[in-house]
Amino acid sequence: MRILVTNDDGFDSPGLHALARALKPFGELVVAAPDREYSGASSSVGPIPLTTEKCRVAIEGIDEAWAVSGPPGLIVFLASMDAFGAPFDLVVSGINPGANVGNPVYLSGTVGAAIVARMVGVTGIAISQESVNSLVETFSDHQTNEQKWETAAHIAASVVSN
């Protein structure tokens, strides 16, 4: 099984890293995530630039990882056109630091990536978790670093394994 892991928080997100490591045993895994923050991007794919930059990045324990100059919806769309090799069987987006519940779920780039996956005929899963204390989107922040990333990653892995 080929698995694409993405998010809306950028390739340096600790939630993305934990998720990728947890899903690695389930197939050929590729990480392709935005080169910067795209929270609130929903399932947007544009405006589509004439060129979209992608560059290899290092994530500990992951063989193939890319930083892409675009929102997660565009990344999933590009993946459906073989921008990262053969077609994917599954797209998993997250782990988002924030619950993504209620009406704001429609604005979530994390959820948007899963929606675009479904639109291109691939199963998509979005993983979010409530933040410690308050919503924090800066990954150097002490509260975000206290998130229980491994717990959410373990739950995601159990969903994928079934």
Residue positions per predicted region:
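Short, Asp-centered acidic motifs that coordinate Mg2+ and/or phosphate
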Residues: 90
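Glycine-rich, Lys/Arg-enriched anion-binding loops that position phosphate/diphosphate groups
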Residues: 119-162
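Short glycine-rich anion-binding loops that position phosphate/pyrophosphate groups of nucleotides
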Residues: 9, 37, 71-72, 96-99
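A cross-family phosphate/adenosyl-ligand binding-site feature
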Residues: 3, 14-82, 86-87
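Short beta-strand segments
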Residues: 6, 32-34, 93-96, 126-128
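Hydrophobic/aromatic ligand-binding patch that stacks against planar heteroaromatic rings
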Residues: 113-118
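Nucleotide-activated donor-dependent transferases that construct or modify glycoconjugates
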Residues: 1-9
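Glycine/threonine-rich flexible loop motifs
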Residues: 99-108
